[in-house]
Each structure stands twice: as structure tokens, then as C-alpha cells.
Amino acid sequence: MKALVKREAAKGIWLEEVPVPTPGPNEVLIKLEKTAICGTDLHIYLWDEWSQRTIKPGLTIGHEFVGRVAALGSAVTGYEIGQRVSAEGHIVCGHCRNCRGGRPHLCPNTVGIGVNVNGAFAEYMVMPASNLWPIPDQIPSELAAFFDPYGNAAHCALEFNVIGEDVLITGAGPIGIIAAGICKHIGARNVVVTDVNDFRLKLAADMGATRVVNVANQSLKDVMKELHMEGFDVGLEMSGNPRAFNDMLDCMYHGGKIAMLGIMPKGAGCDWDKIIFKGLTVQGIYGRKMYETWYKMTQLVLSGFPLGKVMTHQLPIDDFQKGFDLMEEGKAGKVVLSWN
């Protein structure tokens, strides 16, 4: 079968022939229909410092997907051949304190598909049946293909009550863009998104952000004055940029709450005085709650949330290089690849 493989310890990704995997007793074989390129895939493609210490060459990458059940392991029940599914890309142990306590998204033994084990950029893949998420007929496959990052955005946006609140989102990558839309969809008052990429800031505005701010040439505090704000009630940090995070701390209202998804560089500093004397709550966010986030994000789409606005490109798998080029240039929202 065809698969996108990190063949060499260098920049690039390679379309290769690899064996079709065989599902174990509790696994399902999935025939992939559509996959989407994540920022993680771009890191692996670029072969940056993180990927060099994390990824073993020879890995099939990818973790955003939708497909159909092609074969069932001998112990699998509850699914049918041909059923359309996506899946939670974090495979958890099931026996640690957090897994047994109903907090599997905090499993310390988590294994990520397309990072630690072979992933979804292939014609077929295997997944534990317990990780599958059935996709309702009303949801198009091109949207279901990126439910994984949509789930990151939903987990972050729903961590704190944003109804009637002023929300600051630092980072207009696809997850930040989707989070802006979710916050407006569920009733936030003002949603302000900051970045330095005008293309992606426009996508955030199209998704419903009240204001978008290119901080390279505009002051966030000036925008706050224009909106008659004293400070932000909720912050969603999506950029992994220390300067953006410190700007957020500076602009938070006393008692505000921050959900952090962006990964800061090691040793990055922050103004702890702002956190302490403003009484801020800072909550780390990783992945999706299993499977409450999946339920809520499915219902959001079924209730009219315009998730499709963040998708900018659909390409056949043979044009995968164009997709990675667009992502590297920052000239895309979500890029979806078709395996049909």
C-alpha cells in the first residue's frame, strides 16, 4: 500500500510502498479516505529539533483522518465493515491511576499515532477499537478528517466558561482559528486573536473573531481601548511564543483564566508577578478529553458550527508535496489529502 514515510533523517517526506498492517484481536483495520496535515507533521517534515529527538526514521506519519472499517479483530464488537470512523490519536494504557479514574487524556503512558507508532498517512492503518469515533452521515469526510485538531481547539475553548466573556487567543494557526469560532458560537462577547500572519488572521476573522490584531504593527492595548475593555477574562494560548504569552499576562483581567495549548521553548520565562498578583489560573491543555470533547465537537458541527471555514485546500495524495509547501509558507488553513 502507499504511505507517507519519514524515510530519512533530513527535511522531507516520501511516498513509499509498505505492507498492509494486520489488526490484532482488539484492533480495527481502517481504509483511509481523507487525512489532514497537522503542525506536528510539518515539524516532522522540516526535521526540527523536536522531531530529531522524537521521531525514528521509517515511521509512517499522520494522525488526522477519516476512513471506513475494512476488517475487525477477533474480539471487536460494536462496529461494522464499511462504517465511517475517525479516532482518538492518543492510545492510552488503560491501567494507570488516571485511566482507571476516568481521566485517560492524562495517561502518562500515552502513545501517539504518527509520532510513536505508524500513523494515518497511508491507504490502511490499524487502531484499537476503543479509540474509534463513529462519524454521523451529516458530517462530510473532509471535515471529519481534521476532528483531531478541532478537538484540541474544543478542549481549550471549553475549559473555562466563556459565555458573555472577553477572550484573547494568541496564535492564529488552525487550532486558534477554530477556537475563535467556537468561542463566538457559544456566546463569548469579544474574541480577539493575535498573530503576525495576515492570511491566517483573515481566516480567524472569517470564523467570527471580533477583532484580529497583527502585533507586528498594531498594539493589543489600543484594541482593548477601542473595545472599552479593562482586561480579558479568558486567555487561550495557542502560539508557543513567550512574547505572546507575556502580552497575554499583561492584558488579563484580575482573576482571569488561561488555557495553554502552545508549547513554549525550554527555559522560556514569564512575568510571575502578573500571575500571582492578578490571581490568574493557568491550565495546561493536552489532546482531547476522552470522549467528552469528541461528543461536544460532533454536536457543535451538527448544530451549525461552520468548521469548514478553516479548510483552505483539498488535494489528491499524489500532490502531498504541494500541501507541505503551503503549510511551510503559512499560506493555508487546514490542508486535506484524499486517498480515494
Swiss-Prot record:
Compartments in which it is found: Cytoplasm
Record has Cell membrane as a keyword: no
GO CC annotation: cytoplasm
Cofactor(s) this protein requires: Zn(2+)
Cofactor binding, note field: Binds 2 Zn(2+) ions per subunit.
Gene3D superfamilies: Medium-chain alcohol dehydrogenases, catalytic domain, NAD(P)-binding Rossmann-like Domain
Main location (coarse class): cytoplasm
EC primary class: oxidoreductase
Annotated residues for binding of NAD(+): 175, 195, 200, 261-263, 285-286
Family the entry assigns: Belongs to the zinc-containing alcohol dehydrogenase family.
Protein name: L-threonine 3-dehydrogenase
